[in-house]
């Protein structure tokens, strides 16, 4: 796994933010924002039912209990699996206010149908279509790196690490059964933060 140094990483995050919030297609934009804010796997997100999101006066969360089954299936036959990619993937995570706003916007955008994220035809998103969309629009946003929908999940982990969120809490949030991936990202980012601190204390 290749890691970027902090200035490069910050620049990439800025580019991804532009891509996420300024994508011309509203439905893709909302999906990318959701992936960035939740750290969910793409297959988990596009499999969400509207009733998987729970909002009360004091709390908002989403239950992640499946992934989209799409291989060797027509769009009409795509459906949600009974479990996630791993046992640790079966989880419930808190939603920030921005994600709640996206949820409410999606309900207005997709008043019919089971799935939270839908195309203009009312069908579920296809993972291949999402990645194709990213590749076709990255040049417009001046992003010169290879892109897939997984980049939003990695960016979510990196940002939480920079903010000082404990490793175990990040692992629990993103549903990593094998913590190696999360730990590698976390250790790399926190190392960069420590190096920045060394530079800062020299300015005291």
Please provide the spans of the model-predicted regions.
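Structural detector for helix-capping/boundary residues
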Residues: 14, 48-51, 155, 184
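Short, basic (Lys/Arg/His-rich) helix/loop patches that form interaction surfaces
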Residues: 18-28, 38, 93, 109-115, ...
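Basic, Lys/Arg- and aromatic-enriched nucleic-acid-binding interface segment
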Residues: 1-48, 58, 88-90
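DNA/chromatin major-groove-contacting recognition/catalytic segments
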Residues: 18, 74-77, 163, 184-204
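Residue-level detector of conserved, well-ordered beta-strand and adjacent loop positions
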Residues: 2-8, 65, 96, 118-119, ...
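Conserved tyrosine-mediated DNA breakage-rejoining catalytic core shared by Y-recombinases
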Residues: 48-105
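Gram-positive cell-envelope targeting signals
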Residues: 46-47, 124-127, 188
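Short functional hotspots where side chains directly engage DNA or cofactors
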Residues: 61-64, 148, 159, 168-189, ...
């Amino acid at each position: 796994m290749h890691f970027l140094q902090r200035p490069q990483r910050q620049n990439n995050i800025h580019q991804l933010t532009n891509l996420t919030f300024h994508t011309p297609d509203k439905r893709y934009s909302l999906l990318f924002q959701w992936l960035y804010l939740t750290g969910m796997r793409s297959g988990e997100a596009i499999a969400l039912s509207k009733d998987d999101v729970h909002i009360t006066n004091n709390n908002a969360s989403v239950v992640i209990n499946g992934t989209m089954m799409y291989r060797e299936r027509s769009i009409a036959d795509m459906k949600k699996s009974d479990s996630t990619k791993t046992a640790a993937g079966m989880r419930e995570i808190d939603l920030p206010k921005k994600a709640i706003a996206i949820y409410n916007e999606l309900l207005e955008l997709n008043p019919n149908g089971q799935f939270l994220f839908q195309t203009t035809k009312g069908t579920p998103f296809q993972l291949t279509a999402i990645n194709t969309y990213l590749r076709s629009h990255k040049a417009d946003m001046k992003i010169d790196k290879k892109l897939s929908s997984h980049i939003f999940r990695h960016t979510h982990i990196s940002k939480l690490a920079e903010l000082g969120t404990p490793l175990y809490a990040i692992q629990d949030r993103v549903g990593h059964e094998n913590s190696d991936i999360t730990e590698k990202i976390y250790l790399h980012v926190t190392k960069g933060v420590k190096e920045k601190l060394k530079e800062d204390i020299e300015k005291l």
